[in-house]
Amino acid sequence: MQDPNADTEWNDILRKKGILPPKETPVEEEEDEQLHLQSQSVVKTYEDMTLEELEENEDEFSEEDEHAMEMYRLKRLAEWKANQMKNVFGELKEISGQDYVQEVNKAGEGIWVVLHLYKQGIPLCSLINQHLAQLARKFPQSKFLKSISSTCIPNYPDRNLPTLFVYRDGEMKAQFIGPLVFGGMNLTCDELEWRLSESGAVKTDLEENPRKQIQDQLMTSIRCSANTHRDGEEDSDED
């Protein structure tokens, strides 16, 4: 009698007709198939994980999985670096009104945009442009732009200059309008950095508002001056 499990063309025909039962899968083949499915499952898990998740779950994987895990970690790291490189700016860029939609509204998901409306001949505008150029180099992940007010917004009043608009994902998150908001020509780069950090545009390493330090120094100076004046009056009375 012919072996029903034999790999013959006739047996294959009988199996298709339902005369013979399906061929039994050897135990070793079943185990290999299960290992393959498990491996695919592990790979899919790696693909779905972020770099942080790979680090957190590293101890849960067996030694056999280390190569696959390292491969996907490197892949994720390369993708992250590529994404970071795409979002590096590092300079204060001049734009016109025609560039506004592309440079601001379509800057990219999660990109902070700082736009300075200015006009030549206004000293405070020039000072802020200097500060922004410095901050653009310090915070290359944020986009720093400048535009002559009349080319960006027709008939924009000069009394509102300088003006800073802060955007993210095409939405305005903060605005600073007019010279009084900036404190005049005494504005320092650290003060401007702090203001922008409060809006979320940059992540500052400053531990406290530099304006507060100036105010504290000013108050100390006033108190010292008042004490000196009072001591002088007391000396005059004694004479």
UniProtKB/Swiss-Prot annotation:
Source organism superkingdom: Eukaryota
CDD domains referenced in this protein's UniProt entry, alphabetically? Phd_like_VIAF
Question: Phosducin domain spans which residues?
Answer: 28-201
Key words, A-Z: Angiogenesis, Apoptosis, Chaperone, Cytoplasm, Endoplasmic reticulum, Phosphoprotein
Knockout consequences: Morpholino knockdown of the protein causes significant inhibition of angiogenesis.
Pull one GO CC term from this UniProt entry.
perinuclear region of cytoplasm
Any idea where this protein resides?
Answer: Cytoplasm; Cytoplasm, Perinuclear region; Endoplasmic reticulum
Where is it expressed, tissue-wise? Expressed in endothelial cells.
Q: Where is this region: Disordered?
A: 16-37, 217-239
In residue numbers, the region (Thioredoxin fold) covers 89-239
* MF GO annotations: protein folding chaperone; vascular endothelial growth factor receptor 2 binding
Q: How does it assemble?
A: Interacts (via thioredoxin fold region) with kdr/vegfr2 (via juxtamembrane domain).
Q: Give the function comment from the record.
A: Acts as a chaperone for the angiogenic VEGF receptor KDR/VEGFR2, increasing its abundance by inhibiting its ubiquitination and degradation. Inhibits the folding activity of the chaperonin-containing T-complex (CCT) which leads to inhibition of cytoskeletal actin folding. Acts as a chaperone during heat shock alongside HSP90 and HSP40/70 chaperone complexes. Modulates the activation of caspases during apoptosis.
Name it.
Answer: Phosducin-like protein 3
The organism named in the record is: Danio rerio (Zebrafish)
